[in-house]
């Protein structure tokens, strides 16, 4: 048990628990169950307070990745884990400043929002019994009690659970994980049975009268009385026969538990149909940039000025012509739209002073491309509720699409290194509290691995485009504004560079609700010939607009330059999330951190330096038909980042559903690999739930194909 505790808990928690036990003359090596219980209780107290702050207005907020400039105060003061003298000093100080009554016993936390002390309980027994014991011991209505159990139950004073559901779910999941880990090492039974009640119980708590009647009425089905139910709960064996538990739940439930063996799972069925097409809001691996180094022109930093300067670096423009039409569109309109952009940029240059923004003339081609006057007229419901055959218009089922090879190629490209740096070191942001040495060291190592990654370029491009589009949508609602697609980076030598990918023209944008749509036309430069993979470009009309001279090993070669044009749309909420794409950096950093933590707890010292600097070691990156792919720690960082970025770029209901449902199957397979002998019922229903999300989304189809590779290798 002692080894388990040292592996399972953060070294800081283990150290605090050892200190606390020594303070009471107890030995962690002998009283190992108590050691585990104290660590668990400490961790729950810390998780309870994590991410909860009070802002300048005194409102309670949850912040998982802090804005370094926000003036935030921690919502909870942690008293548990301090030595007794310090803990009482903190309690006395709180009582003096807030006027709250001083508690008889040391509580665990103080809540600055609700102005009350909190006693946290973690029990291996029945929450109600433990709650009553705590209440009896404290005998104070001022201290709020919150009990968690290892089975996911909780109980709190007046059913006031203080925290939001997600924060509490995090605690319950962690407790459930600890229990599973103990069970897999055959430690759980002894730990469960070792819990003693609160020593200060004086009388048995009897329920009488009306409360007793209510208790009898509110029992689950099949229980005649409270005694009967209590006896069942006391004798409830969590790892007993699941069928028995189900039969006690309800007469309706009829589930037969099937053993889940290596031969049980089948691969997911991916849809047949035409190959899937690109649906990201901007080009990824196929994008081409017109760039200026060390920009110092007049108006540098104003997007329109930067764009014109970038356009002037290219001399190979030619009369545009359509090389790949859009099947359903009026293609000449796309051609005329590009010619209009060129003409209006020329007009700007002829003006004495270049304006900061450019609104396009409302030509027929732009009105068509932006869907002007195409939306059906809205009628007030009161005016038509008497119409007999009023119904929602029929919409077609989405056509199933099959996985195309371009999706994996896009992902591989996103993991690669470019020759420019896309984020400065402080992009991930400092913590509100002074960040300790280890955390900043990890951040710097991680940033060094991903700053040149193509996925990081996509983040900065996405942030820029979404910010510019949302600004324009609010500032120029009726105008067809021309928005350059720009990014900034640094070259290997540290020189600043401004890049132009193309342009967006925004349609009318009276966005009242979060989901109201603004249409836009995107026009993006590329060297990719669309005729090589026409299925990828189904939604695009592609023009040839120039010839570019490229330096190669054999000298200069001329390549045609293409313009990928399409009509697209987005909403306020999508743009808001697009502006927050930097969060992907944080998410992947946290995933890497948990790998370092696992390694550190085994070695019992911080392994950050060794983790990043041992270049010879390889790590698992993912599954492919060839087996488990491995790579350097840098490759792991970039792959995790690319996954996070693609989840953002290709966010969809299909992805939400697939992630949630496939995770269940993944956990069952993991349990089988850990020899936990999992059992399932209605596995067919789970497969159905997963496969109904596999329709036409390229990123979901690729993830499903990876999942099948994982199944094959995991069950060998």
Swiss-Prot record:
Q: Does this entry carry the keyword Nuclease?
A: yes
Q: Which Pfam families match?
A: Flu_PA
Where do we find the motif Nuclear localization signal 2 (NLS2) here? 184-247
Broad enzyme group: hydrolase
User: Where is this protein primarily located?
Assistant: host cell
Q: What is its EC number?
A: 3.1.-.-
The protein, known as: Polymerase acidic protein
Q: Describe the function of this protein.
A: Plays an essential role in viral RNA transcription and replication by forming the heterotrimeric polymerase complex together with PB1 and PB2 subunits. The complex transcribes viral mRNAs by using a unique mechanism called cap-snatching. It consists in the hijacking and cleavage of host capped pre-mRNAs. These short capped RNAs are then used as primers for viral mRNAs. The PB2 subunit is responsible for the binding of the 5' cap of cellular pre-mRNAs which are subsequently cleaved after 10-13 nucleotides by the PA subunit that carries the endonuclease activity.
Details of cofactor binding = Binds 2 manganese ions per subunit.
MF-aspect GO terms: endonuclease activity; metal ion binding; RNA binding
Name the active site residues: 134
Q: Which family does it belong to?
A: Belongs to the influenza viruses PA family.
Q: Which UniProt keywords apply?
A: Cap snatching, Endonuclease, Eukaryotic host gene expression shutoff by virus, Eukaryotic host transcription shutoff by virus, Host cytoplasm, Host gene expression shutoff by virus, Host nucleus, Host-virus interaction, Hydrolase, Inhibition of host RNA polymerase II by virus, Manganese, Metal-binding, Nuclease, Phosphoprotein
Q: Which residues form a coiled coil?
A: none
**Result of altering residue 38 to T:** RO-7 resistant, reduced affinity for Baloxavir and Baloxavir marboxil
Q: Which cofactors are required for activity?
A: Mn(2+)
